[in-house]
Curated annotation (Swiss-Prot):
<keyword id="KW-0119">Carbohydrate metabolism</keyword>
<dbReference type="InterPro" id="IPR005845">
    <property type="entry name" value="A-D-PHexomutase_a/b/a-II"/>
</dbReference>
<dbReference type="Pfam" id="PF02879">
    <property type="entry name" value="PGM_PMM_II"/>
</dbReference>
<keyword id="KW-0313">Glucose metabolism</keyword>
<protein>
    <recommendedName>
        <fullName>Phosphoglucomutase</fullName>
        <ecNumber>5.4.2.2</ecNumber>
    </recommendedName>
</protein>
<feature type="binding site">
    <location>
        <position position="290"/>
    </location>
    <ligand>
        <name>Mg(2+)</name>
    </ligand>
</feature>
<feature type="binding site" description="via phosphate group">
    <location>
        <position position="135"/>
    </location>
    <ligand>
        <name>Mg(2+)</name>
    </ligand>
</feature>
<dbReference type="GO" id="GO:0004614">
    <property type="term" value="F:phosphoglucomutase activity"/>
</dbReference>
<dbReference type="InterPro" id="IPR005844">
    <property type="entry name" value="A-D-PHexomutase_a/b/a-I"/>
</dbReference>
<dbReference type="GO" id="GO:0006006">
    <property type="term" value="P:glucose metabolic process"/>
</dbReference>
<dbReference type="GO" id="GO:0006166">
    <property type="term" value="P:purine ribonucleoside salvage"/>
</dbReference>
<dbReference type="GO" id="GO:0008973">
    <property type="term" value="F:phosphopentomutase activity"/>
</dbReference>
<comment type="similarity">
    <text>Belongs to the phosphohexose mutase family.</text>
</comment>
<dbReference type="InterPro" id="IPR036900">
    <property type="entry name" value="A-D-PHexomutase_C_sf"/>
</dbReference>
<feature type="binding site">
    <location>
        <position position="292"/>
    </location>
    <ligand>
        <name>Mg(2+)</name>
    </ligand>
</feature>
<feature type="binding site">
    <location>
        <position position="288"/>
    </location>
    <ligand>
        <name>Mg(2+)</name>
    </ligand>
</feature>
<keyword id="KW-0479">Metal-binding</keyword>
Amino acid sequence: MKDNWMKYKDDSLVASFYDSQTTTFQEQGFETELAFGTAGIRGQFGLGPGRLNRYTIQRLALGIANYLKDKEDNPSIVIHYDIRHLSSEFAHIITQILTSKGIKVYLADVYKTTPQLSFAVRYLQTSAGIMITASHNPKDYNGIKVYGADGAQLDEDTSLEVAQYINNLGNPLELNIDLNQELIEKNTFDLQEAVYDSYINEITNLIGDIPQSDLKVVYTSLHGTGVPIIPDVLKHLNFQNVSLVELQCELDPNFSSVKSANPEEREAFDLAIQQAHDLEANLIIATDPDVDRMGFVERDTNGQTYYFGGSEIGALLIKYLLEYTNVPNHSVVIQSIVSGELGKRLAQQHEVTVKEVLIGFKHIAKAIRELDDTESFLFAYEESYGYLADDFVRDKDAIQIVPLIIKYTSILKNEGKTLHDALKEIHREVGQYRDKPMSKVFEGREGQQQINALMDKLRRNIPDVIAGLKVIAVEDYETLKRNYKEDNTEEAISLPQANVIRILFKEGFIALRPSGTEPKLKFYLSLNVDNFEQVSQDIYNYIFGDTE
C-alpha cells in the first residue's frame, strides 16, 4: 500500500507534513482508516487512508455527494472553513466534487466560524452544511464536520448512513473523479452578505442594550476566526471598551503563542491576563479557533484573577437569564449529563425544567428539536465551555455568549458587584457545588483493555458508600438502567446508549467515560461537600487504586 501512495505524494497537498513525521507515525497512516462519525472526521495530515490528504478528502466529498443525490432531487449545501492548514484547499476540493455532481454549493470566500455555518444552513434552507475545522486541536489536525438541514451536527443514524456511502467507494487512490468545469461554475455560489447581516441582527436582538459602565474587557481569539466577528458584534452593540490581544488576534494556523488554543486551559489566558494587568481591565475573554467555545477570567481591583469553570459559566448565564430577562412559562434548560449540579439546581429552584442529554452538542440540538409546543428553549450548555442562549443556531455559539457575559458583567459592575459575587450568590442559594474534570491515561497496547476492564469492574460492583458519601443510585448508559441502591429497584433511562457510568449521591454525582479519541478514562465530579479536594482524591483513589 505504501508504495502506491508514495506515487501520489507530490500532489497530495501534505508532502511537507509527511516529510517532517517520524517513520512510526508515517507507517500508522497506512495501517488505519479515517472513520466518519457523528462529528464527521478529524485527523492529522499525512499519507495513507488514515490521514487527511487530497485523496481522503476527495473520497469523503464523493461519498457525501452520492448520499445527497440519493436523498434529494435538488440538494444544496453551505461550506465554511477556518484558518487551519489546508482548510481553504479542502473546501475548494469538496466544492468542485459536489458541484460537478450537480449539487448547489454556497462557498464562503473567506474563513468563517462554526456558529455562522449552523446559522447559514438554517437561513439559506440548504440540505446540509460542511465546516472544515478541528476546533481546538493541535496545529497538525484538521477535520470535516457535517451538518443537517436544521443546522445541527448529524445524528447517529444519519452519520452511519453517510459513512456507508463513503466506505462503499473503497480505495481513495482509485476513485472516479469527474470534474466538470461548466457544472462547477454553474453550481458554485458566493455567500450573500445578507447571511452575515442577519446573523449579527439575531445576536443584537438577543443581547439588547449593554448598559454604560466603566467595565474594561480584554479579548483574545487565540489566533482563530473570532476576529473580526467578535469586535464587529460588540461594535454593533455600541460596546467600545474592549482591547484585543494583538499578537493572538493575528491569524496563525500554527497557534504560535499558545501551547493549546483552548479556553479550557488556563495557560491560554496568560498573554491576555498580562494585558489586563497593564490596562487594569476587569474581564478577560478567550474563544477557541472556530469560535464555538469560550471561557473567561475575572480580575478584581487588587489584581487577583479568578478562572471560571465550564459549569460555573453555565450557572452564571442561567442566573443572568433568570434575573434580567423575561423567562417564559415552561422554559427549558438543556445540559449534558456531566455538566454539573450548580446550574441544574439553580434552574430547578426557579421552576425551570432541566433536560439532561448525552455528551455532545448534537444531543442538545436533538432535544431542542423535540421540544413540544408548550415548551420554550431558554439555554443549553456543556461543561466543556460550549453554550447556546438562542436556538437560531443549533451548535454551541461563543459569538452569542461573549456579548451576553459582557452585558451581565456591566450590569453587575453598576450594582457594585462582580461575576465572582454572583457565583457566591448561586452557592448561597443552591449549595457549594464544585466541579472537577479529571482523567487518567492508559498507555500502550493494553491501555484500551485496562479502560474496558475498569468500566466492567465498576458495572459489576459499586459499594453503598464511596469516600464517605452514600450512593443513592447508579446510572449505566450502556444498559440504560438506573439502579436505586436502597431498595434495589431499577428504572429505564430514556437516552441513547453510551459507555458512561454515573453515580448519584445526595451531594451530587461522579461520572466516568472512556475518551473517544485518546487512551484516556475521563472522570467528572460535581459535589457539594465541605472538604471537596480530599473527597475528590479519595474518589479518584477508589476508582483508580488498582491501576496505580
